[in-house]
Amino acid sequence: RDRSVSRGLGDVYKRQILDLGLTLEYLETHGVTVIGYGTSELPAFYTRKSGFGVDYELDTPEQLAKAFHVKRELGLRGGLLVTNPIPEEYSMDKEVIDKAIAEAVEDAKKDGIHGKATTPYLLAKIKDLTGGDSLDSNIQLVFNNARLGAAAAVELSKLEK
């Protein structure tokens, strides 16, 4: 496993809320293929759309498992990142969340927040600014990702028997 990629992804995650284009550039540079689950557009954190494309769109857990399996069997380097849109009913209004993010980022700068304190600070500030709606969205995103990850893992286990 390429440790420089796994170490760097934490930094990318912190900046993800700020610059998805930069995140995609970083991932491409480090050989990480970005897959959209049921979408050709990279989902943003709180919304289903970002305006950025993904490398491939796959529509079933079976397809995801096959992609991981084939990559492993061929010994290809780099990673695969599956991006899974937030369920529609929990997607936030883009203007509302963009405004909250911008305000939270500005407050973080004013308060001298940096390093590993950045993500918790931003998430808490955005939660406050959205009256808790961002937390509800975040929780549903986690549940949705867990369901997809579990389904893909079941399918991958069938391929690797």
Put a short name on every predicted segment.
Residues R7, T29-V32, E41-L42, L76-G79:
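Short coil/turn connectors at secondary-structure junctions
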Residues I17-G21:
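Short glycine/serine/threonine-rich phosphate/pyrophosphate-binding segments
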Residues G79-N144:
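A C-terminal functional module that forms or caps the active site or interfaces directly
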Residues R7, L24, E57, E88, ...:
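N-terminal loops that bind phosphate or other acidic moieties
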Residues R1-Y13:
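Single conserved hydrophobic/aromatic residue that forms the stacking wall/gate
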Residues K14-R15, V32, Y37-L42, P85-P87, ...:
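Short, ordered loop/turn segments at secondary-structure junctions
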Residues L22-T29, F45-Y46, S50-G53, V96-A102, ...:
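Short, solvent-exposed amphipathic alpha-helical segments in soluble enzyme
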Residues R48-E73:
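Anionic-ligand binding region
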